[in-house]
Amino acid sequence: MECVFGLVGNGFAIVAADTSAVHSILLHKNNEDKIMVLDSHKLVAASGEPGDRVQFTEYVQKNVSLYKFRNGIPLTTAAAANFTRGELATALRKNPYSVNILMAGYDDESGASLYYIDYIATLHKVDKGAFGYGSYFSLSTMDRHYRSDMSVEEAIELVDKCILEIRSRLVVAPPNFVIKIVDKDGARDYAWRQSVKDVTTAVV
């Protein structure tokens, strides 16, 4: 029951993802961070098979870092998204990754942006996007309330509405979410929305 969604506001982009590590009917942990910081001004929120998700996002992160190391300048968000799409398309003909990605970033020239990349290497620049079962509810909620000139506070309020809708509509809804933001000041954690915490000590 993975849920990943994001939106672009006035000078920033926000992505949110559930934090449940699930296999079949088993929940392994409630604090799995599915949003990776690619570099100082890029975020990748991913859903899909856990092994593919971790391996592919780390592969993209290392290649983005390698490009900056070799050339002395970072990739733009559009370039990083196109690189990611290209790698997914190449793998699709050999050993496909079951992973869907929302890439958010901020560039000095073009500002904040959000890219939708699915497991068959479809790439679109979007104002809002979502993957997983939660997309049925988060997309409709964002369609109703989203504006391109939203402030950070308004965008977070909309994200909370989406999380509430997902929790109230899905039979097996993920309890916890992580929210991250990227703007001119960089990519960073914004908040966690927790209704369940991992039990770290055994109960006798």
Curated annotation (Swiss-Prot):
Disulfide bond is among the record's keywords: no
Quaternary structure (record): Component of the 20S core complex of the 26S proteasome. The 26S proteasome is composed of a core protease (CP), known as the 20S proteasome, capped at one or both ends by the 19S regulatory particle (RP/PA700). The 20S proteasome core is composed of 28 subunits that are arranged in four stacked rings, resulting in a barrel-shaped structure. The two end rings are each formed by seven alpha subunits, and the two central rings are each formed by seven beta subunits. The catalytic chamber with the active sites is on the inside of the barrel.
CDD domains tied to this protein: proteasome_beta_type_2
GO cellular component terms listed in the entry, alphabetical order: apoplast; cytosol; nucleus; plant-type vacuole; proteasome complex; proteasome core complex, beta-subunit complex; secretory vesicle; vacuole
Residues annotated with N-acetylmethionine modification: M1
Family per similarity comment: Belongs to the peptidase T1B family.
Source species of the chain: Arabidopsis thaliana
A Pfam short name: Proteasome
Lineage of the species this protein comes from: Eukaryota, Viridiplantae, Streptophyta, Embryophyta, Tracheophyta
Its biological purpose: Non-catalytic component of the proteasome, a multicatalytic proteinase complex which is characterized by its ability to cleave peptides with Arg, Phe, Tyr, Leu, and Glu adjacent to the leaving group at neutral or slightly basic pH. The proteasome has an ATP-dependent proteolytic activity.
Single GO BP term: proteasomal protein catabolic process
Predominant subcellular localization, coarse grouping: cytoplasm
Alphabetical keyword list: Acetylation, Cytoplasm, Nucleus, Proteasome
Protein name listed in UniProt: Proteasome subunit beta type-2-A
Keyword Acetylation: yes
Name of the coding gene: PBD1
